[in-house]
């Protein structure tokens, strides 16, 4: 039985480009896939997102543990429902992207706000751990 770390497919969904990556153990394990954002309709948006994730999946040839991606709000992130997005005129609210991707890829899908995920990543792997080290060395009880 393999005890390798799980592979997560990721997407940073912007109004201009969709940037897809595959991650394992905190690092990118394949070439990044960048596709022009298809924002005119839910169908074209879905097709582009599936194409990007399929391209990654075929390039790594290993089982996928989950899909996680950043999408601008508003959205019901817990349930994976995308709302009305200014940069995505073809998405008119109640776009069940989580369900669509889980059905297609047969793995869990997690969607969150792009700003929240940036802050979370910065807290774990960015400058924040270094700040905490400096505070601890200075004898400060503060920790962020």
Locate predicted features.
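Short glycine-rich anion-binding loops that position phosphate/pyrophosphate groups of nucleotides
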Residues: 16, 72-75
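Glycine-rich phosphate-binding loop and adjoining helix at the ATP-binding site
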Residues: 43, 76-143
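Alpha-helical structural signal in soluble globular domains
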Residues: 23, 55, 100-104
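Phosphate/pyrophosphate-binding loops at sites that engage ATP/ADP/AMP, CoA/4′-phosphopantetheine
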Residues: 49-67, 108-109
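Short glycine-aspartate micro-motif
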Residues: 8-12, 64-68, 110, 136-137, ...
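Short glycine-rich, Thr/Ser-proximal phosphate-binding strand/loop in the N-terminal lobe
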Residues: 2-47, 51, 58, 82-84
């Amino acid at each position: 039985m393999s005890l390798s770390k799980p592979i997560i497919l990721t997407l940073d969904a912007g109004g201009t480009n969709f940037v897809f990556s595959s991650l394992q153990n905190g690092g990118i394990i394949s070439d990044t896939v960048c596709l022009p954002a298809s924002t005119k309709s839910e169908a074209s948006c879905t097709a582009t997102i599936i194409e990007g994730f399929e391209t990654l999946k075929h390039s790594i040839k290993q089982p996928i543990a989950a899909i996680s991606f950043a999408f601008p709000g508003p959205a019901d992130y817990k349930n994976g429902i995308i709302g009305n997005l200014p940069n995505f005129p073809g998405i008119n609210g109640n776009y069940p992207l989580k369900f669509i991707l889980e059905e297609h890829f047969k793995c869990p899908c997690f969607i969150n706000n792009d700003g929240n995920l940036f802050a979370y990543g910065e807290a774990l792997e960015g400058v924040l751990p270094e700040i905490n080290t400096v505070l601890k060395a200075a004898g400060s009880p503060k920790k962020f």
